[in-house]
A protein has these predicted regions:
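Conserved beta-strand termini and adjacent loop/short-helix elements that scaffold enzyme active sites
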Residues: 59, 134, 159-161
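Acidic, histidine-bearing metal-coordination/catalytic regions of metal-dependent phosphoesterases
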Residues: 1-69, 80
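Alpha/beta-hydrolase fold active-site loops
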Residues: 68, 171-172
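Short acidic-hydrophobic surface loop/beta-edge motif
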Residues: 54-58, 162-169
Length: 172
């Protein structure tokens, strides 16, 4: 059910995040395993380089998740690749998308002194089903415990050696 939704959503996002095509794509998989992708070339946010929208269906995902909006963000590398304005743009964009849940894929920062700022910014994204994160290689360095503390303070669920089940409209 929901675990399949999360697994296939993350898998699809990771797979298609490296695509450079601006054309729409329909998966050759059967309808019950369908992922449709389109790339939005202009996000309206100067510092946000790429926004992609996917529609996903799977026979095991309950009808309660119809219209569920998941967001995925990763590799922000705050302060080397992404500056303050870009971080504000991303959090504003994520809030404007009215997501049900946000998935964070790690590599959030480029220095321990930036951990509180980047996690606080992501913590203000309003998601009724929650914000979930995994850590990247940059996140396991010197400030690992600072990241854990900041994520807990912001209500971000760290999925480290564990899983969670999303619940929506009576479905799981």
């Amino acid at each position: 059910g929901c675990k399949s939704l999360l697994f296939f959503s993350v898998l699809g996002l990771l797979f298609f995040s490296s695509c450079r095509s601006t054309q729409s794509f329909t998966s050759p998989l059967p309808e019950e395993y369908s992922i449709r992708m389109s790339k939005s070339s202009a996000s309206g946010y100067k510092n946000v380089k790429r926004v992609r929208k996917y529609e996903f269906t799977h026979r095991d995902v309950p009808a309660a998740f119809d219209g569920c909006r998941l967001g995925f963000v990763s590799d922000l590398h705050y302060r080397s690749l992404l500056k303050e304005k870009g971080l504000r743009d991303i959090t504003r964009l994520l809030n404007n998308l009215r997501l049900d849940a946000l998935l964070i894929g790690g590599d959030l920062h480029e220095g321990c002194e930036y951990v509180p700022d980047v996690i606080a910014a992501l913590g203000v994204v309003k998601t009724p089903l929650g914000t979930y994160a995994v850590l990247g290689n940059n996140d396991y360095e010197a400030c690992y415990h600072d990241i854990l503390k900041e994520m807990e303070r912001q209500g971000i669920h760290l999925l480290e050696h564990k899983a969670d089940t999303l619940k929506r409209n009576g479905g799981r």
